[in-house]
């Protein structure tokens, strides 16, 4: 292990949600180890805390089985370089944050070199490819899970796992202030707003921008006073979305915001969004939503054959039943989106809000502190 008194933690975060988790964990670990060094692949929030990124985390932000194949040589080269660098560095612990197809192989190699490894965010082994749990058991000293039902799955297979809760549930208040959010964004305090979130990755916008924009046009016809607001994660995604608007809805007025997705969701009356971590955020800000998603037909056919779940979005998975509508693949059409969004705009939301509140409280556990404590105990165990 690292021979000096300074603790060294290596981390790899694969996308924005991982960057948030990584930043929270770094802050919590610094409480115990103020002089610790953090190195690997991180996003902007991690970098702002002094994290040393060896590669841009955009390298890992690839969606879909088919899409990954075209980038595979580069991904393998990045992983090989990381293995070499970290084997030489010998950190006190390696923490792979999500990105399981990249990180678990990395963890396997590092653990074989005597480096303690943690995987933060359980892969969806309970949903598809369940045999991955045997590789996870070999690759990691411990899994940190965000969702309460995951620990039981790991316990059943005798894989060390700690349920830590979710940082988003800690960060987002139990009650979100719609008027304050609108004031922050300069939105009309009296209008009805639909937030449209087509995803944070280029591949997601490629698949979802067109049906989302076309649905917005139809919704405007049905609700002439309805307004739209869309957060885009960066200038590149904004340009991609603006091209979809120009192509499919040149006359549609949508208020575009760079970043601030949580504020946008809090400002909205309802949300149309891609499946992913954003659905959890929408649940935590207590807004009715419609989840839609599609990938390339080949990716979908391969994935569908491996799936062992009946729900895709986190709110439905946490509830164990469908509490919000999901429009997946062939169902992700403008007309179906319009009908589902209309039901959310016009419906009685009291039972849904009660479900959201219960789930929020289950996940609110001071996740970063719990995760840090689990890592500290692992590192301090000889």
From Swiss-Prot:
Keyword set includes Lipid biosynthesis: yes
UniProt-listed Pfam families: LpxB
Record keywords, A-Z: Glycosyltransferase, Lipid A biosynthesis, Lipid biosynthesis, Lipid metabolism, Transferase
GO biological process, one term: lipid A biosynthetic process
Recorded catalytic activity of this chain's protein: a lipid X + a UDP-2-N,3-O-bis[(3R)-3-hydroxyacyl]-alpha-D-glucosamine = a lipid A disaccharide + UDP + H(+)
Gene Ontology terms for molecular function: lipid-A-disaccharide synthase activity; phospholipid binding
GO CC term, one of those recorded: membrane
Signal peptide: none
Function according to Swiss-Prot or TrEMBL: Condensation of UDP-2,3-diacylglucosamine and 2,3-diacylglucosamine-1-phosphate to form lipid A disaccharide, a precursor of lipid A, a phosphorylated glycolipid that anchors the lipopolysaccharide to the outer membrane of the cell.
Family: Belongs to the LpxB family.
Protein name: Lipid-A-disaccharide synthase
Natural source organism: Shewanella loihica (strain ATCC BAA-1088 / PV-4)
Taxonomic path: Bacteria, Pseudomonadati, Pseudomonadota, Gammaproteobacteria, Alteromonadales
Encoding gene (name): lpxB
């Amino acid at each position: 292990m690292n021979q000096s008194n300074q603790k060294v933690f290596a981390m790899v975060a694969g996308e924005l949600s991982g960057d948030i988790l990584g930043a929270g964990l770094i802050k919590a670990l610094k409480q115990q180890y103020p002089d610790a060094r953090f190195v690997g692949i991180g996003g902007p929030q991690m970098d702002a805390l002094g994290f040393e990124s060896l590669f841009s985390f955009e390298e890992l932000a690839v969606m879909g089985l088919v899409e990954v194949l075209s980038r595979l040589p580069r991904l393998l080269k990045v992983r090989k370089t990381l293995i070499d660098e970290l084997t030489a560095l010998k950190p006190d612990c390696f923490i792979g944050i999500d990105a399981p197809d990249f990180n678990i192989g990395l963890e396997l190699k590092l653990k074989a070199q005597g480096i303690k490894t943690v995987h933060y965010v359980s892969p969806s082994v309970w949903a598809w490819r369940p045999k991955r749990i045997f590789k996870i058991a070999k690759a990691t000293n411990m899994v940190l899970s965000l969702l309460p039902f995951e620990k039981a799955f790991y316990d059943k297979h005798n894989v060390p796992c700690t349920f830590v809760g979710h940082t988003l549930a800690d960060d987002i208040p139990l009650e979100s202030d719609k008027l304050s959010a609108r004031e922050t964004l300069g939105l009309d305090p009296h209008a009805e707003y639909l937030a449209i979130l087509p995803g944070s990755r280029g591949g997601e916008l490629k698949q979802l921008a067109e049906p989302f924009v076309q649905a917005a046009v139809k919704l405007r016809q049905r609700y002439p006073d309805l307004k739209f607001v869309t957060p885009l994660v960066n200038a590149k995604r904004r340009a991609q979305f603006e091209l979809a608007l120009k192509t499919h809805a040149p006359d549609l007025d949508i208020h575009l915001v760079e970043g601030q997705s949580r504020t946008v969701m809090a400002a909205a009356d309802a949300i149309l969004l891609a499946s992913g971590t954003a659905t959890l955020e929408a649940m935590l800000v207590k807004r009715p939503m419609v989840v839609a998603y599609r990938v390339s037909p080949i990716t979908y056919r391969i994935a569908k054959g491996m799936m062992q779940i009946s729900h895709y979005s986190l709110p439905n998975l946490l509830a164990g039943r469908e509490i919000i509508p999901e429009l997946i693949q062939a169902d992700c059409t403008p007309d179906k989106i319009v009908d589902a969004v209309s039901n959310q705009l016009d419906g009685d939301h009291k039972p849904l809000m009660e479900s959201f509140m219960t789930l929020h409280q289950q996940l609110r556990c001071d996740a970063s502190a719990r995760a840090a404590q689990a890592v500290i105990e692992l590192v301090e165990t000889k």
